[in-house]
Amino acid sequence: MVGPLTVVDRDPESGEPIRSDCTAMGSGAYTIPSSNDHLILESSAQFVLAIETGGMFQRLNHHRYWRSANCILVEMGGVPTRATRRFVRRLAEDLKLPVYAFVDCDPYGICNIYRTLKVGSGLSVHVNRDFCVPTARFMGVTPQDILDFKLEDATHPLLPVDVKRAKDALKNDPFFQSFPKWQKALKQMLEMGVRAEQQAFAKWGLNFVIEEYLPVKIKKAKDFLP
């Protein structure tokens, strides 16, 4: 995790505060501890960008996207851990920051990674309540992004497992059944028969995602998928 955020912990022996400035991590990042409810969070950021892959996180951090966009970048590293979900929940709840998810356009990214961030894992509702981010919104990559940003030749065919996962979500998952916009997006993906990774934008240049895609999308945050 990196960006305009100060995390205040305490020395377990002396009780003295320990302040971690997450804009001063060099080429690295702040590691979210497994237990983080005791931490004090201070930030001037405008939003949180939760990113699926380490590669994209590192690229955005290297180019200091968090500085130009005044946001906090969080690497989910696939399906986000309970600690990551709890930390992002606190950013959303305690600091009142909007949370946007940036994952691959495939059934796994949508139905596993994003869904887990948004509503939690398959555990009980009581447990999920503290380890999910109900206010999170899906920025992309969406099936419509493939068309809008002309990524058709940077896609891959959906695998049988992808088709099965998307159809199962449409038929059996209450979350996706609750949102017509998600039903439309998943059906669009199935009709197109393709998936796209975050790295697909590199067809337009290595910095396209930073200079074009993200700025365009963030301006339309109110239109993000629920």
Stretches found by the model and what they are:
Residues 1-98, 107-226:
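Nucleic-acid enzyme cleavage-core boundary/entry regions
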Residues 104:
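Active-site glycine-centered loops adjacent to acidic/histidine catalytic or metal-binding residues
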